[in-house]
């Protein structure tokens, strides 16, 4: 899994004027909190923390650009370590050359990756290398893997979570063997997939849950899937979630953006750009939801929704690469290998496609009628046209 990561520092520098108390954004204080890990100090360091965050890097070269890139990543980790100093989270560096034996023991195989050790689990962080993203990711990871719901207000909050995969189960108590299996299954997917449980009969009734039953909610779907053959073992729950882990409509998130991008279907993604905070973007997203609900049983369909507001530093890159305007809703098919793309023609914001028109376009993509090779042909035509124009110009000059 080799790629060039886009590392975004995410550090904001305060102006010289004094900030009001309560709004002092953290800046690096110069104290070293990130240490080098070796076989000699590994066990000692591991015992000190509930989570251990390890940056596995190649030896720092003499190249100035490479050195600066490494220093930027180091500063990000130092700031995160500073912000989370009150938590039981440790931060270390692992040199791929000096500590090759330790890296092999830990199963590290990709230089430039960030790994988190939690108990007997190793989680690879596959998102945007930015301080705010890392802090949120680690705070989610340090929490209990299952959140308990015990009131009507908490049910309402649960129901409003629509853009994550989520599961909820009804169990007799925390001592139930079936709850323990559910909890252990949750650890496999934390923090990417949300696991909830209730021991309250009233909550279970409101959610139409039977004892020891678990419901699986796909993002943006109105109705859940009741996992069959209850009660379940840990292995059965893990297997079911893995089989249903690619939703019909999913959101690209900073904390898992690279992993999501690599989870393509036959080398392509159907990508939709829409700003949820914008009226036209919101309307387009609602149309996408309707299409996803109508086609949730199609295993070949997975639409990747990107809210440009989540990735402000990538907007200009995407507009240049895909030749589109991200201030308007867009949907297209993207080749993940070379970023070739073809985009649906949407005349203007006041004339967004209907769900039926969008379904027809998607069917053409899935059938191969619309594909990124068309984009290559268009580029070739443009090149040929330019050459012909140049030839004509040369002829005129000769005359």
Swiss-Prot record:
Entry-linked PROSITE patterns: CALSEQUESTRIN_1 (PS00863), CALSEQUESTRIN_2 (PS00864)
Glycosylated sites: 335
Residues of the signal peptide: 1-19
Effect of residue 66 to A: No effect on calcium-binding and calcium-dependent dimerization
Keyword Cell division: no
A single GO cellular-component term on record: junctional sarcoplasmic reticulum membrane
Chain positions with Phosphoserine modification: 385, 393
Superkingdom assignment: Eukaryota
Record's compositionally biased regions (Acidic residues): 373-399
Role according to the record: Calsequestrin is a high-capacity, moderate affinity, calcium-binding protein and thus acts as an internal calcium store in muscle. Calcium ions are bound by clusters of acidic residues at the protein surface, especially at the interface between subunits. Can bind around 60 Ca(2+) ions. Regulates the release of lumenal Ca(2+) via the calcium release channel RYR2; this plays an important role in triggering muscle contraction. Plays a role in excitation-contraction coupling in the heart and in regulating the rate of heart beats.
Descriptive protein name: Calsequestrin-2
Organism: Homo sapiens (Human)
Gene that produces this protein: CASQ2
